[in-house]
Amino acid sequence: MSQSFNRHRRLRTSKAMREMVKETRLHPSDFIYPIFVVEGLEGKKAVPSMPDVHHVSLDLLKDEVAELVKLGIQSVIVFGIPEEKDDCGTQAYHDHGIVQKAITEIKEHFPEMVVVADTCLCEYTDHGHCGLVKDGVILNDESLELLAQTAVSQAKAGADIIAPSNMMDGFVTVIREALDKEGFVNIPIMSYAVKYSSEFYGPFRDAANSTPQFGDRKTYQMDPANRMEALREAQSDVEEGADFLIVKPSLSYMDIMRDVKNEFTLPLVAYNVSGEYSMVKAAAQNGWIKEKEIVLEILTSMKRAGADLIITYHAKDAAKWLAE
């Protein structure tokens, strides 16, 4: 038989051999776990559209984070659901808002936990949009000041990282200036630089009670059909002072992740969003897929595509599986 071909299978002959030449590895420290803290809630409450994800009360937050620490997960991103909402999202930037209280609670008990604060208005506005609204139009420049106030209040509460997710033009510049003015020059910005207008966000909007009450978010979030626009968005945020770049969603946007990783040297964060999570959970519950294998394959693929960190609701399960 001719020996002119390459025998690639030599490096696949055993589990040990495959492990030796593995190019991409997952570790619990790669994961950022999202937590939904609800004002006025007693105990925990399941999110129906996101199996195994819960709303958590402030008094149970310590136990929730303690579990993450035991699993080796070193970072959380905090979302808050207030009791009261208004057209200006006042509770987003209130010094005693639910997210501010949650951040302080986590840092008091777990000072080494890296707390990322989601900086947006949609969970706090009665209309569900990420900025101020006038005559049905989401106002850009007028919303920036409120976002800056939100970021500063979160930093004062103890946030390690500010993560603005609103997709208003200029948000990184305004937030950076506000943080620096208040003395928070060492607080990094994890920018939702590339955030598409996606139907994969559906379960999250249930969890965060942030579904728009009119229209959609297509005037400020990106068109899923666009690729080059992602690089323009990322470039703007790099120039404005971002320290991390997020691509959201990620499972259907790995080409975008690779483009961004190839173009920029900042740490890249993949957001493995709620719809991606819930599809896997639903299929696994029906016995159509092997959940463990699918989840680890998806997360590995995101890292292979260029992600340095992954925001994922699978974090706890994945950390347990990686420890087996």
Swiss-Prot record:
The protein's Enzyme Commission number: 4.2.1.24
Q: Which PROSITE patterns match?
A: D_ALA_DEHYDRATASE
- Cell inner membrane recorded as keyword: no
What this chain does, per the entry, is described as:
Catalyzes an early step in the biosynthesis of tetrapyrroles. Binds two molecules of 5-aminolevulinate per subunit, each at a distinct site, and catalyzes their condensation to form porphobilinogen.
Which co-factor is required? Zn(2+)
Q: Which residues bind 5-aminolevulinate 2?
A: 274, 313
Origin species, per record, is Bacillus subtilis (strain 168)
Q: Subunit composition?
A: Homooctamer.
Protein residues bound to Mg(2+): 233
Active-site residues per Swiss-Prot or TrEMBL entry? 195 (schiff-base intermediate with substrate), 248 (schiff-base intermediate with substrate)
The residues that the entry says bind 5-aminolevulinate 1 are 205, 217
From the UniProt record, list the reaction(s) this protein catalyses.
2 5-aminolevulinate = porphobilinogen + 2 H2O + H(+)
Pathway as given in its UniProt record: Porphyrin-containing compound metabolism; protoporphyrin-IX biosynthesis; coproporphyrinogen-III from 5-aminolevulinate: step 1/4
Biological process (GO) annotations held by this record are: heme biosynthetic process; protoporphyrinogen IX biosynthetic process
Record protein name field? Delta-aminolevulinic acid dehydratase
Enzyme kind, highest EC tier: lyase
Task: Check the record and name the SUPFAM superfamilies matching this protein.
Answer: Aldolase (SSF51569)
Cofactor note text: Binds 1 zinc ion per monomer.
Q: Which family does it belong to?
A: Belongs to the ALAD family.
